[in-house]
Design a protein with these regions (language model features):
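Inter-helical loop and helix-membrane interface segments of multi-pass membrane transporters/permeases
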Residues: 4-9, 28-38, 99-115, 156-159, ...
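Hydrophobic mid-bilayer segments of alpha-helices in multi-pass membrane transport proteins
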Residues: 14-28, 37-59, 81-86, 118, ...
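Juxtamembrane and boundary regions of transmembrane helices in multi-pass small-molecule transporters
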Residues: 34-36, 172-180, 184-236, 416-417, ...
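Core transmembrane alpha-helical segments of multi-pass membrane transporters/permeases
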Residues: 41, 45, 65-101, 114, ...
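Membrane-interfacial loop-to-helix junctions in multi-pass transporters
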Residues: 75-80, 105-122, 150-159, 241-249, ...
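Hydrophobic alpha-helical transmembrane segments of multi-pass integral membrane proteins
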Residues: 82-90, 112-144, 330, 343-388
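Alpha-helical transmembrane segments of multi-pass membrane proteins
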Residues: 114-127, 153-169, 173, 359-372, ...
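Re-entrant/interfacial helical elements at transmembrane boundaries that shape
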Residues: 136-147, 164, 177-189, 345, ...
């Protein structure tokens, strides 16, 4: 009884407090990400400790309550953590089986630096739109294109930008992806098909700009001449070190078939990894135990050709251990700030000042990027932003699909640019390029962001509600 009396009453965070904690957290994480003085994971951990300490000392939130929020946040991303483990297996087994070397070899033979960025962007975009599975494409076709680009002497940030832009098209407009669905539900639309159709309006011109932009970069970029010279040496090393039989594409075909059959992606990736292990034994003549060990510790290339060995020594579950630790810290941090109510109070204060449709969509874009940055998830960001903006859009007679497309389109691509988000961490681990090095060159993302805001200011392709429709939606929200 005395303990209950001595326990201080929990209070809500004020706007001033939220802004200060927000800025300090951003500074700590940003310093770690940009200065490279210590790992990003440590910056996130420091911000996590700061927010936990402030929550307990100033807001009187109990540790049990904070820990409950942390466990809920981590459980929500358990799929991503397990997927990273399986991607490590895929990378190692597909290199050992000859799948990745086969794609490297023929990519080097058929492509040249002048068309590489354009081809990488278009092919990954088409595959991602059809499958809706960016995470399956990245460690397969994405990894292959990255290796090809490196060998051709294409600067890594340009290659990564083209690959990531294309691979994550599925998160933006694929009918088989959950990001548009969740954004639609969060916006109060419940019509994901309508949201995707609406998204195509800014998305198509953005993709055209992306095609032109990547082609222009290809024509003007400085090629690493040593990389171009070593392409022939690389092909010789690949041909001598591996059996480049077309059957080595079976693991890749397996994952595509399973995706089209709607087979769950997590066990699907595991099955494709097992197919790679079997092929490594049958086609490459490797020992069974050796291949299985490689899926844990990573593939170590010993072809005798330094350029080949540098490209192919990678993968394995342990190669993703650091990524998984960073994700655990990041989503723990997301759970704590959600419990604090920090983002909600900042966004609610901002929305009260908005007068025009253009400013509202611009603000939604900004808070979507902030939401993804702090939660590490496009879906969680959509749920937070949707709950805050839903009524504001309806009251201004703006159709919920405009809110949904703004959250889904911006959140999906931005998610791939943050090294502490699940998608961004996967990009970093697979491609080996710091996310912030290619962020500026994500041409379709920036184009779509600007076009969507311009549409809102001009009223073009910004669907409106009748007063009756708005009243009906508001009435449903109040039930």
């Amino acid at each position: 009884m005395s303990k209950e009396k001595g326990k201080k009453q929990e209070r809500g965070i004020t706007l001033v407090e939220a802004v200060i904690v927000f800025m300090v957290s951003i500074t700590v994480i940003g310093y770690a990400a940009l200065s490279k003085q210590f790992p990003i994971a440590m910056g996130i951990l420091m911000a996590l400790i700061l927010c936990c300490g402030y929550s307990m000392a100033a807001l009187h939130i109990s540790w049990d309550s904070l820990f409950d929020s942390i466990t809920k946040a981590i459980s929500a991303v358990l799929f991503g953590l397990l997927f990273c483990l399986f991607v490590g297996m895929v990378c190692a087994s597909w290199i050992a089986s000859g799948t990745i070397p086969f794609l490297f070899y023929w990519g080097l033979r058929l492509l040249n630096p002048d068309i590489f960025l354009l081809v990488a962007f278009v092919i990954t975009s088409i595959c991602s739109f059809l499958t809706g599975q960016p995470w399956a494409l990245l460690p397969s076709i994405g990894l292959a294109f990255m290796g090809i680009g490196t060998a051709l002497g294409v600067p890594a940030p340009f290659a990564a930008a083209a690959i990531v832009s294309g691979c994550f098209v599925g998160d933006v407009v694929s009918f088989t992806n959950e990001v548009p669905v969740i954004a639609s539900i969060a916006a109060g639309s419940n019509d994901s098909v309508g949201t995707i159709k609406s998204t195509f309006k800014p998305f198509i011109p953005a993709m055209i700009i992306g095609v032109v932009g990547f082609f222009a970069i290809s024509m003007t970029m400085t090629i690493n001449t040593e990389g171009v010279t070593s392409a022939d040496v690389l092909m010789e090393g690949l041909a001598s070190g591996f059996n480049l039989n077309p059957l080595t594409l079976l693991p890749l075909a397996t994952i595509f078939i399973l995706v089209f059959l709607k087979f769950p992606i997590l066990p699907g990736v595991f099955v494709a990894s097992v197919v790679g292990i079997v092929e490594a034994v049958l086609l490459q003549g490797m020992n069974w135990n050796t291949v299985v060990n490689m899926t844990w510790s990573g593939y170590v290339s010993n072809t005798g050709t330094a350029s080949v060995d540098a490209l192919l020594t990678r993968g394995g579950i342990m190669d993703f251990a650091g990524t998984i630790i960073m994700l655990i810290f990041a989503f723990s941090f997301a759970g704590v700030i959600k419990r604090m109510g920090m983002l909600n109070i900042i966004m609610s204060a901002a929305i009260s000042k908005v007068k025009s449709t253009g400013v509202l969509v611009a603000l939604t874009t900004l808070t979507t990027l902030i939401g993804v940055s702090f939660t590490g998830s496009a879906n969680v960001s959509s749920m937070i932003n949707g709950s805050i903006y839903k009524d504001a859009y309806i009251e201004r007679r703006i159709h919920p699909e405009v809110l949904a497309r703004t959250m889904a389109m911006n959140g999906a691509w931005w998610n791939a640019m943050l090294p502490w988000s699940a998608s961004g961490a996967l990009c970093l681990a697979v491609l080996g390029v710091n996310n912030f090095e290619y962020t500026f060159f994500m041409i379709p993302f920036w184009a779509a962001l600007i076009i969507n805001i311009v549409f809102a200011f001009t009223g073009i392709f910004t669907r409106r509600l009748t007063q009756e429709e708005a009243d009906a939606l508001l009435q449903n929200e109040s039930l």
